[in-house]
Every structure is written in C-alpha cells, then in structure tokens.
UniProtKB/Swiss-Prot annotation:
Any one annotated GO CC term: ribosome
Function: One of the primary rRNA binding proteins, it binds directly to 16S rRNA central domain where it helps coordinate assembly of the platform of the 30S subunit.
Source organism per UniProt: Bigelowiella natans
Cystine connections: none
Signal peptide: none
Compartments where found: Plastid, Chloroplast
Subunit structure: Part of the 30S ribosomal subunit.
Keyword terms, alphabetized: Chloroplast, Plastid, Ribonucleoprotein, Ribosomal protein, RNA-binding, rRNA-binding
Predominant localisation class: plastid
Gene Ontology biological process terms, A to Z: translation
Protein name in UniProt: Small ribosomal subunit protein uS8c
C-alpha cells in the first residue's frame, strides 16, 4: 500500500528545509488537485506537469516553492498530517477546526472533491481531514 499524499508532503517539507527552488512529485490526480489548491491559496509559486521518458513515459508535477524575497523564508511554515492510512479522521462541516484563526487552511476530501476547510464550511460539506498547512 502506498501513501502518495504522505510522500508528497514529505518531499515538499524536505525541499523547504534545504531551500530548493522546485521539487518533482509523481503525478496522481489527487496530488495535482491538492497542489492546485495550494497554488490558489498562495502557498506555492506555480505547478507544471512534466513528462520524463525512460522505458515508458512517467508524468511528474514540478512544484515551484514560494519564498519571501526579503527574508528568504518559505510561505509554508508547517504542514501537519491529520488523516493517515492507519487512522482516518472524518468530521462534519460544523466541527472543522480553524488553524491560527484563519491564517492556515485544512485540506478536506469531500464527496464534492478536494477543497479547503473554508469552502467545505461555506458549502456545508464534511469529509476527511487530510492535512493542515500554515
């Protein structure tokens, strides 16, 4: 059993720690949707789909990390995994926690797709709490 979300989050964390400009993440639809949300929320600079050929074609997502120009600190301060394969965390829309009084977000997997905690609350949809980011 593979944990693609966990691998993606660890690659992003490690790239931030060593101040890489970009990181390659294996393409899955779930990874792409989550990264697109993080880009829209301002945590990432941009994302591109890249193809690499070896014996067969592999798709990757090239994620360009966003840093503050003056302090060279990342816009992502912390990523905290909430739901994992061994312990799933589900909640309804009224009990979705707030991160740092709204400065951070929680990514929620709902029946309507992957969305932020703000969108899930406004649409009155609960689901699985994947991770928090601030």
């Amino acid at each position: 059993m593979t944990d693609n979300l966990g691998k993606m989050l660890n690659k992003i964390k490690n790239a931030i720690l060593v101040k890489h400009e970009a990181v390659l993440i294996p393409y899955t639809l779930n990874n792409f949707l989550i990264l697109r949300i993080l880009e829209q929320e301002g945590f990432l600079d941009s994302i591109n789909i890249v193809c690499k050929k070896k014996k067969r074609e592999y798709k990757y997502i090239k994620v360009y990390l966003k840093y503050n120009e003056q302090t060279s600190k990342s816009f992502i301060r912390n990523i905290c995994r909430l739901s994992k394969p061994s312990l799933r965390v589900y909640t309804n829309s009224k009990k979705i926690p707030r991160i740092l009084n709204g400065l951070g977000i929680i990514i929620v997997s709902t029946s309507k797709g992957v969305m932020t905690s703000k969108d899930a609350y406004s649409n009155n949809i609960g689901g699985e709490l994947l991770f928090s980011i601030w």
